[in-house]
C-alpha cells in the first residue's frame, strides 16, 4: 500500500473516532460504517486501525477537539480539521478532484450521522430526563458536530450592538435584491423536493442535505418538524415547518401553534413572517415559522403605553417603544392571548386609513396588510408580539412604501422579514470590503472613492461625526454607529403608523382602553 493511501485510511480512522466520540456512533457499527466510506472509493487495502504514525498523528486531532470541548462555546465540536485532512489526503491520492471535496465530505458526514429515527429516539430520552430545552441543546450540539450547522461560519460573521439593535454582516448568505422567487417558495428544478424546506430534503444528496436531521413536532394537533438553520442568523436559529407543503398564512391557529411550541421549549421564541411578498420571508409557498434560543431586541423593548379590553381583563396590550409598529399582548392565559391577538389581526388586515397612506387591499383587490407574530414565555406569562406590516407600492416607492427607502439600499435592499423587524439585522457580506474602503479613505483624509460612491449619505454623516478625527478605532466605531443608525431608520420606514399615538388610536377603535 502506498503512503498516499495510508494517509487516506488514517484520516478515515480519525473520522470514525470522531463519530464514536461525538455522533453517538455505536462501536458495534464502527467497522460497518468504515466500510461504507471505503465503498465510496473502492478502497480494499485497509491495514487496520491506527497502525501507522500518520494514523496516530491524525487521530491526535480528534483528541485536541475532545480536550478543548469544555472550552468551546456551547460545548461545541466540529469535524472541520478532520474533514480538511481527509480532503487533502484523498485529493493527493487521486480519489477525487479538489472541487468535489465538499460533496464527498458531506456524504461522509451523512454516513457517520445517526439516522433520523434513532436521533428522534435519543432526543425524546433527553427531553424526558432533562426537559425540552436540554433536549434542544443536545440536538443543536449534534447538528454542529455532524457539520450541518456551520457554527464556525456563524462565529466569523461580524456582529455588534448599536442604537438598540443587533447588527450582523452575514458572510455566507447570498444577497437577494429581487424577491420574486419568494412567491414560488424557492421551488427546486425537477420538482423533488417541492421546495427547499420540504421534509423530503432530509438526507437528500441533490441539495447537499445528507447531514440534515429534523425532529417531529406537533402543533395544534398537526404534524410539523423542526430543523436548525445551517447558516443561522443567531444562536440556535431554526425553522418549524408544516409537514404538508401548504402556503404560508397567518390566522387564528397560528397563535395557538406558536404557544404550543414555546410551551414545550420555553427558552425559545417562535414567530412567523407576514405571509405576503416584500414583507415576508424568501419561502412563501411552504408554511413555516422561525425561532431559536436567543431573545431579539424587540422582545426586550420598553412599553410606550398599555391597554386592556373589557372582555379580557387578564390580558394587557402594550404599544412598544420601537421604530417599527408593534404591540405586545401579555397574559398568563393561553386563550386570552389567542383571542386578543386575533381581534387585532382581523382588524388590521381590513384596516384602511387614507390619511396615513394605509390601504388594506390594492386596486385589484389583493390583500396588502398582514401581521407578523412572535411568541415567548417570561415571568409575566405568555408574550405575543404583533408586528404590523403592509406591502403596498407606489410610483415613488416601487419596491414598497413600507420597505427600506432607496437612500438606504447601499446598506440594505432586501425585504425586512421577521428577524430584522425584531431588531436583528442581517446585512450583506459585500459590506465588509465596501466599508473597508470607506474606512481607509476616512483614515487617510481622502475623498469618497468612486467604487463606493453609493455610500455618499453614510460618508457625509460619518464625516460630520468624526469631524476630522483620523484615528482608525474611532472610525471603526463611527461606522458601527452609522450602520446601527441606518438600520434604525429602515425600521422606521417599515412602520405603518409613524407615530405611537396613531397606534393608540387604532387600538382604541377596537375598544381598548388605556390602563
UniProtKB/Swiss-Prot annotation:
Any matching Pfam family: GalP_UDP_transf
Annotated GO MF terms: UDP-glucose:hexose-1-phosphate uridylyltransferase activity
GO cellular component: a single term: cytoplasm
Name of the top EC class for this enzyme: transferase
Subcellular location, record wording: Cytoplasm
Reaction(s) catalysed (UniProt annotation): alpha-D-galactose 1-phosphate + UDP-alpha-D-glucose = alpha-D-glucose 1-phosphate + UDP-alpha-D-galactose
Principal cellular location given in the protein's record: cytoplasm
EC number(s) reported in the record: 2.7.7.12
Pathway as given in its UniProt record: Carbohydrate metabolism; galactose metabolism
Keywords carried by this UniProt record: Carbohydrate metabolism, Cytoplasm, Galactose metabolism, Nucleotidyltransferase, Transferase
An annotated GO BP: galactose metabolic process
Family: Belongs to the galactose-1-phosphate uridylyltransferase type 2 family.
Role noted for this protein: Transfers the UMP unit from UDP-glucose (UDP-Glc) to Gal1P. Can also transfer the UMP unit to GlcNAc1P and GalNAc1P. Involved in the general galactose metabolism, and also involved in the lacto-N-biose I/galacto-N-biose (LNB/GNB) degradation pathway, which is important for host intestinal colonization by bifidobacteria.
Protein name: Galactose-1-phosphate uridylyltransferase
Record organism: Bifidobacterium longum subsp. longum (strain ATCC 15707 / DSM 20219 / JCM 1217 / NCTC 11818 / E194b)
Amino acid at each position: 500500500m502506498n503512503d498516499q493511501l495510508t494517509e487516506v485510511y488514517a484520516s478515515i480512522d480519525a473520522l470514525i473516532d470522531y463519530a464514536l466520540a461525538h455522533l453517538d456512533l455505536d462501536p458495534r457499527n464502527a467497522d460497518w460504517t468504515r466500510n461504507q466510506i471505503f465503498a465510496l472509493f473502492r478502497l480494499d487495502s485497509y491495514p487496520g486501525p491506527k497502525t501507522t504514525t500518520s494514523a496516530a498523528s491524525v487521530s491526535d486531532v480528534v483528541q485536541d477537539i475532545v480536550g478543548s470541548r469544555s472550552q468551546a462555546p456551547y460545548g461545541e465540536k466540529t469535524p472541520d480539521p478532520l474533514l480538511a485532512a481527509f480532503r487533502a489526503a484523498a485529493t493527493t491520492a487521486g480519489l477525487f478532484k479538489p472541487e468535489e471535496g465538499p460533496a464527498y465530505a458531506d456524504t461522509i458526514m451523512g454516513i457517520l450521522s445517526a439516522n433520523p429515527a434513532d436521533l428522534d429516539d435519543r432526543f425524546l430520552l433527553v427531553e424526558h430526563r432533562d426537559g425540552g430545552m436540554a433536549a434542544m441543546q443536545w440536538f443543536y450540539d449534534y447538528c454542529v458536530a455532524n457539520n450541518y450547522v456551520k457554527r464556525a461560519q456563524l462565529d466569523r460573521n461580524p456582529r455588534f450592538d448599536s442604537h438598540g439593535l443587533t447588527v450582523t454582516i452575514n458572510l455566507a448568505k447570498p444577497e437577494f435584491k429581487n424577491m420574486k422567487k419568494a412567491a414560488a417558495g424557492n421551488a427546486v428544478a425537477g420538482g423533488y423536493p417541492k421546495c427547499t424546506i420540504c421534509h423530503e430534503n432530509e438526507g437528500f444528496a441533490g441539495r447537499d442535505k445528507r447531514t440534515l436531521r429534523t425532529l417531529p413536532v406537533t402543533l395544534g394537533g398537526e404534524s410539523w418538524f423542526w430543523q436548525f438553520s445551517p447558516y443561522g442568523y443567531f444562536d440556535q436559529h431554526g425553522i418549524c415547518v408544516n409537514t404538508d407543503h401548504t402556503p404560508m398564512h397567518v390566522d387564528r391557529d397560528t397563535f395557538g401553534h406558536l404557544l404550543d411550541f414555546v410551551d414545550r421549549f420555553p427558552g425559545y421564541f417562535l414567530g412567523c413572517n407576514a405571509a405576503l411578498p416584500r414583507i415576508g420571508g424568501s419561502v412563501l409557498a411552504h408554511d413555516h415559522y422561525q425561532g431559536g434560543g436567543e431573545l431579539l431586541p424587540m422582545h426586550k423593548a420598553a412599553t410606550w403605553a398599555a391597554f386592556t379590553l373589557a372582555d379580557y381583563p387578564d390580558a394587557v396590550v402594550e404599544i412598544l417603544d420601537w421604530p417599527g409598529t408593534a404591540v405586545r399582548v401579555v397574559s398568563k392565559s393561553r386563550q386570552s392571548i389567542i383571542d386578543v391577538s386575533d381581534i387585532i389581526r382581523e382588524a388590521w388586515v381590513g384596516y384602511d386609513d387614507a390619511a396615513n397612506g394605509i390601504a388594506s387591499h390594492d386596486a385589484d383587490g389583493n390583500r396588502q396588510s398582514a401581521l407578523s407574530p412572535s411568541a415567548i414565555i417570561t415571568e409575566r406569562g405568555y408574550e405575543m408580539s404583533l408586528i404590523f406590516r403592509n406591502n403596498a407600492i407606489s410610483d415613488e416607492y416601487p419596491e414598497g412604501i413600507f420597505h427600506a427607502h432607496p437612500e438606504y439600499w447601499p446598506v440594505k435592499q432586501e425585504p425586512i422579514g421577521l428577524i430584522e423587524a425584531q431588531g436583528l439585522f442581517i446585512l450583506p457580506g459585500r459590506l465588509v470590503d465596501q466599508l473597508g474602503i470607506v474606512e481607509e479613505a476616512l483614515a487617510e483624509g481622502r475623498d469618497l472613492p468612486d467604487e463606493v460612491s453609493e455610500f455618499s449619505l453614510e460618508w457625509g454623516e460619518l464625516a460630520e461625526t468624526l469631524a476630522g478625527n483620523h484615528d482608525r478605532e474611532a472610525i471603526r466605531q463611527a461606522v458601527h454607529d452609522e450602520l446601527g443608525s441606518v438600520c434604525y431608520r429602515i425600521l422606521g420606514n417599515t412602520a405603518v403608523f409613524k407615530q405611537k399615538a396613531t397606534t393608540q388610536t387604532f387600538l382604541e377603535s377596537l375598544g381598548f382602553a388605556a390602563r
